[in-house]
Design a protein with these regions (language model features):
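Positively charged, solvent-exposed patches that mediate nucleic-acid binding
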Residues: 1-118
Length: 118
């Protein structure tokens, strides 16, 4: 698995499908190339101080490390958008939430391409 680092990649994934959870939102989008799964993490400033946002990001990264790769589809990009409740939510519950959110993403039809979210 690789990391998403470019803003354009994050924006492209934002136009894909999404699955909600109490502690995060998972966004996913298929890619045309044969590269590995790529994952990005983001937490907005409204979720607390820099220390709290970094802790949320660290918890999300650890979730993905402990997740079995079979839960994610090959040749896809994913973005986990952290919410404030990720600071206090039980880690096992968050792992279950991530698995079910990824499962819901697989069952959703692809969203309309080029949709503008302003």
């Amino acid at each position: 698995m690789d990391r998403l680092r470019q803003r354009a990649d994050f924006l492209a994934v934002a136009n894909g499908t999404r699955g909600n959870s109490a502690a995060f939102v998972v966004q996913g989008r298929p890619r045309d190339d044969d590269g590995p799964i790529r994952i990005g993490f983001t937490v907005t400033k409204k979720n607390g101080t820099a220390t709290e946002r970094n802790r949320i990001r660290r918890r999300l990264r650890e979730l993905v490390k402990r997740l079995d790769v079979i839960s994610m589809r090959p040749h896809h990009d994913y973005v986990l958008v952290g919410r404030r409740s990720a600071l206090t939510r039980d880690f096992a519950a968050m792992l279950h939430d991530l698995r079910s959110a990824l499962d819901r993403l697989d069952r959703q039809p692809p969203s309309k391409a080029g949709r503008n979210r302003n």
